[in-house]
Amino acid sequence: MKNKIFSILQIVITVFFVYFTVSNLDLSKLFEVLNNINILYLIIAASIYFSSQIISSERLRYILSDNKFIISFKQNFTLYLIGLFYNFFIPGGIGGDAYKSYLMNKKFNWKLSKVVKLLLLDRMIGLGVLCCILIGLYEIIFLNFNFIYLILTLCFLSIIGYYMVKLIFKNQNIFWKSFLYSLANHTIQFISLFIILYSLGIEDGYFEIIIVFILSSIFSVFSFGGIGIREYIFLSSASILNFSPELSASIGLLFTISAAISSLPGLKFIISKPDYLK
């Protein structure tokens, strides 16, 4: 029941922000911006984003294996792709993580509550690293930058994250390696974003754009695949970034499209489940 309510809420939020964003754009100017995009760059951005998901899936596999849930790379990545597709293309469904948990329980007879808890831990570590990057960039751009102070702040936040994982999830071993997995994952996603910016002819203001991107990633959980919210946050940041509303919104839109393209392979495994998952 709770999952159904959350799914309905996600649909409402997605529709609202898509409508609000579109209503505040000159669509002819938006299409003009998109029409100048080299499709090759979008394919490259999507491919790079896809590689970040490989690292993200390996972070989850590491967390699972450390808790005695042994799964092969092929099995885990296939389940990860299925989850990505569910999250992006099936509004009102049970959600990608919930479906992954169900499949793991069915295939490996793993305790469902434990798997759900580990999937939550995986998400929380990724979110924590994003917040650390966000705070670091804020310090660099908006405050009087002090390298030593920045390092001390990030170390302090990392230690807090370590003890939170230890306290809440009763796990002392996985935090630091998972932290590095997350850092690599987000770095590759930033590279994907840079390719999109290059395709739009944007050559400066990258730090500010990354901050907006991180904020859109954090809040994207409230809509399906970040659709609507990501574009709205970029639209709202147009004046800060010194971009036209259409150019700013197109950054979020193109990243959403590249993420959607990267999620499509999951459909193959939903239509025809491989033998190693039966």
Predicted regions and their residues:
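Predominantly cytoplasmic-facing regulatory/coupling regions of multi-pass membrane proteins
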Residues: 1-81, 130-222, 229-235, 243-278
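Helix-loop junctions at the membrane interface of multi-pass solute transporters
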Residues: 65-66, 101-107, 237-240
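Hydrophobic alpha-helical transmembrane segments of multi-pass membrane transport proteins
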Residues: 73-107, 114-117, 220-225
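Alpha-helical architecture
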Residues: 95, 120, 124, 187, ...
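Hydrophobic alpha-helical segments and helix pairs
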Residues: 99-139
